[in-house]
Design a protein with these regions (language model features):
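Membrane-proximal amphipathic alpha-helices
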Residues: 228-232
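Non-catalytic alpha-helical scaffolds and adjoining flexible linkers that form interface surfaces
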Residues: 122, 135-137, 141, 179, ...
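Conserved, helical-rich catalytic subdomain that frames metal- and/or nucleotide-binding sites
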Residues: 163-216
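Short histidine-centered catalytic/ligand-binding loop motif
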Residues: 63-76, 154-168
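N-terminal lobe of the biotin/lipoate ligase/transferase fold
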Residues: 1-95, 113-114, 120, 212-216, ...
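Short polybasic amphipathic segments
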Residues: 107, 216-225
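Short, acidic (Asp/Glu-rich) active-site segment that either coordinates a divalent metal cofactor
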Residues: 128-161
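Acidic (Asp/Glu) carboxylate-rich active-site/surface patches
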Residues: 93-129, 138-139
Length: 252
């Protein structure tokens, strides 16, 4: 990402995050949409812009990236974002707390859905053209808003799972640091290590050997039948599996 030390914040909310360079903070009120706003300002504000929404119940943020590869390859930056989000959760999780990714975008803690990641790019960009920007958006349910335990058995929140009580801001700060490490690894060592890290974090599928194609597709080889399935990343990103558009947050 292109470094730029200029601080930028929303008009109504002061900076609340301690971010490493080259990140620049834009803060929105609780009713804001970090993912949408980051797309709207990406071309003007550029790489390193991190949009954060101050919410009590969610860690909601989005970051602008500027790739130098064609879209079909650059889209794999999504996996760097997912690894960084996973690592941020791991850093604040209780010991031995199970965390897993449902390919490609949903994150579960001890089997319960807490949120996930999204990726956007200029829709008029051809697959073999370099996109002007990418936006990775993340959203994690930090606090449960229901008092009825067991009402939604397939979802959970960080407060219910014993996570450290540092709140959404600490999680996003941790994400930023881990994302920088992931991008540095990609630039220096190629995508291989990021691939390994991501694949080992996927929820298990019995009898499946999984790998990522050059364009980010998930390739699944079944030991029992010698059959191979290919799951296109671009199709999966079209409709995030974890996101409830009506609620504006993770599914229940």
């Amino acid at each position: 990402m292109r470094p730029n030390p200029r601080p930028r914040t929303g008009k109504s909310v002061p900076p609340v995050l301690d971010l490493p360079p080259p990140f620049r903070l834009v803060t929105l009120r609780e009713v804001g949409d970090a993912f949408l706003h980051a797309q709207q300002v990406a071309a003007e504000e550029g790489a390193g812009t991190l949009v954060y929404v101050g919410r009590f119940d969610l860690a909601e943020f989005a970051v602008v990236l500027e790739p130098d590869e064609p879209l079909r390859v650059a889209r794999k930056a999504f996996y760097a974002g997912m690894n960084a989000l996973f690592d941020a959760l791991l850093a604040h999780a209780p010991p031995e707390k199970p965390i897993a990714i449902d390919w490609p975008d949903a994150i579960r803690v001890d089997g319960g859905l807490v949120g996930g990641g999204r990726l956007a790019w200029p829709k008029d960009t051809a697959e073999d053209a370099v996109p002007g920007w990418l936006v990775f958006g993340g959203m994690i349910r930090t606090v449960s808003m229901t008092d009825e335990a067991g009402l939604h058995p397939l979802e959970t929140a960080l407060d219910e799972e014993g996570f450290e009580e540092h709140g959404a801001s600490a999680l996003v700060e941790s994400f930023a640091r881990h994302l920088m490490a992931a991008i540095d690894s990609w630039q220096q060592d190629g995508f291989g290590e990021l691939t390994k890290d991501y694949l080992k974090r996927l929820s298990p599928e019995k009898g499946a050997r999984r790998e990522l194609g050059e364009n980010g597709d998930l390739v699944v080889r079944w030991a029992a039948t010698d059959q191979t399935d290919r799951r296109p990343l671009v199709d999966a990103l079209e409709t995030p599996s974890w996101y409830d558009a009506k609620r504006g947050g993770p599914r229940r």
